């Protein structure tokens, strides 16, 4: 049985800093992030350290990130979120599920009441909250947990109900991927009906779902004049849970299907399509760019060169989740399969602009992998920026919103030549 933990201990563990230095040497192209305004960063100490050194506590199942996410309560003023933080028991995944489900159901019921009274805006707001909280409850659950699928469906139902109350700021899209249908969402700025927008494709992380992405991170790109498409890839969201589709070692096939779709839209400038990656997408994004040449720029938070070395081995608590995502039978099979999930021999095929974000104290993705990617992508217009690892570890990405620098979004705006006036 794990020892009791104080809030101070949780914060201390969650914010532990890695400092095993590997002094970087810029090769050919300066690593200074020239296109980021006052947020410029230079390549220096990369970091990276063994998980047992970074976090002395016992890792939890469900992707292994529960104990990390406990530190986020300090960055919210939401009453329901603070209540969950106060009530959830340390090292207890069941408590995590119970407390998030409790506030989700509360908001779901409130939304039903407001809807019955014809108060559609308020009902929509509470359905959105319910969707968010159901998502928090369900994302750590493994495929074997009987609560996983019903919880995921409740999340989707709340999301759909919110859209029935008030017209959402996005449209639903369906992508034909090799005979399978991938569902997602497209969001764009305002502007003249005939305007064509530069467009961002999101390559999400292991636990991210398109519903959260289109309502969350998409907004900062739309505000800068870019359209945004969020689709759950195989290995994510609905394709994983409802269709049993897994992430392949060549995700450029998925990105190709999305670009093919975007080229059919009259409101998309197909000559200005960018691809962003977060977490596990920090590997998939550069891998896709090695083959999909219609992508004009790529940028990553937690860039990665080799998914096996940079994630599976670096952060053992996530191994079971990775096994599920790639469709392996067991951990040994996962390790064998992951030999193909690499940019070895391919990184030099990246020819577009590339920004590699990393966090020197990132506990989930090895920052050394970001540097290996930077070193190997010799034909890209490459840049590198610190403070862009997993968001629980640094103020730029995970601190109070007023202190965060929108480094990735501003860089993308410049690379895709977006017009902020059109937003």
Residue ranges and their predicted role:
Residues 286-334, 352:
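Hydrolase active-site cap/lid region
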Residues 2-18:
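N-terminal secretory signal peptides and thylakoid transit peptides that target proteins
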Residues 366-375:
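Short alpha-helix in the alpha/beta-hydrolase fold that links the catalytic acid
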Residues 388-402:
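Catalytic histidine-centered segment of alpha/beta-hydrolase-like enzymes
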Residues 153-191:
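N-terminal cap/lid segment of alpha/beta-hydrolase-fold proteins
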Residues 199-265:
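Cap/lid segment of the alpha/beta-hydrolase catalytic domain
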Residues 398-423:
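Catalytic active-site module of serine/aspartate enzymes centered on a nucleophile-bearing elbow/loop
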Residues 350, 356-358:
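Short beta-strand/loop motif that positions the catalytic acidic residue
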């Amino acid at each position: 049985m794990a020892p009791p933990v104080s809030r101070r201990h949780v914060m201390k563990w969650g914010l532990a800093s890695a400092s095993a230095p590997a002094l970087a040497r810029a090769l050919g192209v300066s690593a200074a992030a020239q296109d980021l305004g006052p947020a410029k960063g230079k390549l220096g100490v990369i970091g990276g350290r063994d998980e047992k050194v970074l976090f002395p506590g016992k890792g939890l199942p469900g992707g292994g990130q529960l104990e990390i996410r406990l530190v986020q309560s300090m960055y919210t003023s939401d009453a329901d979120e603070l209540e969950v933080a106060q009530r959830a028991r340390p090292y207890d995944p069941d408590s995590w599920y119970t407390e998030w489900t409790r506030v989700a159901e509360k908001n779901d019921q409130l939304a039903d009441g407001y809807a019955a009274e014809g108060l559609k805006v308020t009902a929509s707001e509470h359905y959105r909250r319910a969707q968010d909280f159901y998502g928090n409850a369900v994302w750590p659950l493994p495929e074997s947990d009987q609560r996983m699928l019903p919880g995921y469906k409740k999340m989707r139902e709340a999301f759909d109900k919110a859209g029935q109350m008030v017209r959402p700021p996005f449209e639903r899209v369906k992508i034909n991927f090799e005979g399978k249908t991938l569902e997602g969402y497209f969001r764009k700025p305002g502007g003249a009906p005939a305007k064509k927008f530069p467009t961002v494709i999101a390559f999400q992380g292991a636990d991210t779902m398109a519903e959260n992405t289109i309502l969350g991170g998409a907004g900062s790109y739309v505000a800068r004049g870019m359209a945004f498409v969020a689709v759950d890839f195989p290995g994510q969201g609905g394709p994983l849970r409802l269709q049993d589709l897994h992430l392949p070692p060549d995700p450029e096939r998925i990105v190709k299907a999305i670009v093919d779709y975007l080229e059919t839209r009259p409101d998309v400038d197909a000559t200005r399509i960018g691809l962003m990656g977060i977490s596990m997408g920090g590997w998939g994004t550069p891998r896709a760019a090695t083959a999909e040449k219609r992508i004009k720029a790529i940028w990553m938070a937690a860039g990665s060169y080799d998914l096996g070395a940079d994630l599976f081995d670096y952060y053992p608590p996530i191994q079971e989740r990775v096994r599920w995502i790639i469709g392996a039978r067991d951990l040994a099979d996962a390790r064998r399969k992951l030999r193909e999930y690499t940019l070895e021999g391919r990184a030099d095929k990246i020819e577009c602009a590339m920004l590699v974000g990393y966090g020197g104290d990132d506990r989930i993705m090895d920052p050394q992998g970001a540097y290996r990617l930077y070193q190997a992508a010799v034909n890209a217009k490459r840049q590198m920026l610190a403070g862009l690892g997993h968001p629980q570890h640094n103020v730029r990405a995970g601190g109070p919103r007023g202190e965060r620098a929108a480094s990735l979004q501003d860089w993308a705006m410049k690379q895709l030549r977006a017009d902020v006036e059109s937003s």
